[in-house]
UniProtKB/Swiss-Prot annotation:
Subcellular location: Nucleus; Cytoplasm
One GO cellular component term noted in the UniProt record for this chain: nucleus
Record's function text: Acts as a central player within a network of stress response pathways promoting cellular adaptability. Functions as a negative regulator of TP53/P53 in the cellular response to telomere erosion and probably also DNA damage.
Bias (Polar residues) ranges: 156-170, 195-212
Superkingdom assignment: Eukaryota
Keyword line: Cytoplasm, Nucleus, Stress response
Protein's name according to its UniProt entry: HUWE1-associated protein modifying stress responses
InterPro entries, A to Z: HAPR1 (IPR040308), HAPSTR1-like (IPR029196)
Family per similarity comment: Belongs to the TAPR1 family.
Gene name for this UniProt entry: hapstr1
Keyword Hydrolase: no
Region (Disordered): 1-22, 145-170, 195-218, 240-265
Gene Ontology biological process: negative regulation of signal transduction by p53 class mediator; regulation of cellular response to stress
Length: 265
């Protein structure tokens, strides 16, 4: 059992991530790991600033001492000049050191990022997904991987549609119309309009006088918004658009010039 376990571990090591890299890639990785961070330069800059600060402090103290213990015939110009020169050098070196430390910080940041990416690459497979790399660089969790199944095609007859699709399409098409009526307040302004509310399928093509009387008795003053809602509900319950019968079409054109001419005769 132990021999088999050792053989399995040796196979894993032989086929591990380190064996995926070529000779050139291994050389680049070794050079990246051996790069030393420029800490010596930072220490030298700090020592130089400390030395200039000591000189400035000594010059200012000497200027104060000479001013207190001033003797006749001695000028304070030389101590003042020395103090001003020391403070100026300290300021210039401080600005330069600040810029160098800023550049050094950027360089160290790049090196650390490269090392982190290389360490992450060593643990990954031979092929790295784009979203995994972007999520690692941005410090976020990669999105879940959904299995991309092929879309299913449903064949529907062009002359026949399902009631659900018909109702939803009609509802979607008439939604702007209903919103327009609600926004402009036509329900109250159009309440006095006469709307035909006869039952579907009733005979309407009759003589002139009886047709006129029946049309007057069948028309009622109803709210326009209520009428539209009832018609839409009736239309959706039937499962599709309804075609008007020839009798209804004849009722619509009763006021045509030909019909009026017959009445005149």
């Amino acid at each position: 059992m132990e021999d088999k376990k050792e053989e399995g571990e040796s196979e894993i090591q032989e086929h591990g991530p380190e064996h995926w890299f070529s000779k050139w890639e291994r050389q680049c990785l070794a050079e990246a790991e051996q790069e030393d961070q420029p800490e010596e330069e930072a220490e030298q800059s700090q020592q130089k600033l400390w030395h200039l600060f000591q000189n400035s402090a000594t010059a200012v103290a000497q200027l104060y001492k000479d001013r207190v213990c001033q003797q006749q015939g001695l000028s304070l110009w030389v101590p003042f000049q020395n103090a001003a020169t020391a403070v100026t050098n300290l300021y210039k070196e401080s600005v330069d050191a600040h810029q160098r430390s800023f550049d050094l910080g950027i360089q160290i940041g790049y090196q650390r990022r490269n090392k982190d990416v290389l360490a992450w690459v060593k643990k990954r497979r031979r092929t790295i997904r784009r979203e995994d790399l972007i999520s690692f660089l941005c410090g976020k969790v990669p999105p879940p991987r959904n299995s991309r199944a092929p879309p299913r095609l449903t064949v529907v007859s062009p002359n026949r549609a399902t009631p659900t699709e018909t109702g939803s399409s009609v509802e979607t098409d008439l939604q702007p119309f209903r919103e327009a009526i609600a926004l402009h307040g036509l329900s109250g302004a159009m309440a006095s309009i006469s709307v035909r509310s006869s039952t579907p399928g009733s005979p309407t093509h009759v003589s002139g006088s009886s047709n006129t009387g029946r049309r007057r008795n069948g028309l009622h003053d109803v709210d326009l918004n209520t009428f539209i809602s009832e018609e839409m509900a009736l239309h959706l319950d039937n499962g599709g658009t309804r075609k008007r019968s020839s009798a209804q079409c004849g009722d619509v054109i009763t006021d045509s010039p030909t019909h009026k001419r017959n009445r005149m005769i």
